[in-house]
Amino acid sequence: MEVKGKETASVLCLSKYVDLSSEESHRYYLARRNGLQMLRDRGYEVSDEDINLSLHDFRTVYGERPDVDRLRISALHRSDSTKKVKIVFFGTSMVKVNAIRSVVADILSQETITGLILVLQNHVTNQALKAIELFSFKVEIFQITDLLVNITKHSLKPQHQVLNDEEKTTLLKKFSIEEKQLPRISKKDAIVRYYGLEKGQVVKVNYRGELTESHVAFRCVW
């Protein structure tokens, strides 16, 4: 019992030296960087300078306990300047309807957007979800833990390529099939959510492995 007491005391003593603010800023840093990369992969204009910002420089700019409002990201689409998306970070509190309405009102008072991505650290209420459905633009919800790692960079994840409308039409004609005959991939799939895909869009999946032959498959979002 005496040993356990000493161990507990040691843990409590060491906990004083754990910098929770550093952990917090690191989480925000990773989520923001991967959010920027996600936007670029969706075809939005994102600078190398923003993506390659170091953790040290991030903390210099935003501090050890970043203000979530300062972490917001706006980006225009490279091929369609009418498309503008915004990423908004929330703190650790439960996200209620008033918080959603306040954030959206603040954004729309300054700019016009066609898409909004919310990065949360807690649950969102049903009332808030219902309010989100009423907005005229697409709203996507990610937990901050979803963005701590870029899943497209994982060594075990096959490469995914999103087909445009012309490539999709060519594919269907080549194999003389209809869209509904393609193998499906769920809208809830992590890759589908990463690219923000909609029902009917098609992805080309390149499988490469040391134990299996390389092959290509096509999946239709359903």
Swiss-Prot record:
- What is the protein named? DNA-directed RNA polymerase V subunit 5A
**Taxonomic placement:** Eukaryota, Viridiplantae, Streptophyta, Embryophyta, Tracheophyta
Q: What Pfam family is a match for this entry?
A: RNA_pol_Rpb5_N
Q: What Gene3D superfamilies is this protein classified in?
A: RNA polymerase, Rpb5, N-terminal domain, RPB5-like RNA polymerase subunit
Tell me where on the tree of life, at the top rank, the source sits: Eukaryota
Gene Ontology biological process terms, A to Z:
DNA-templated transcription
Protein's cellular compartments? Nucleus
Record GO cellular component, one term: RNA polymerase V complex
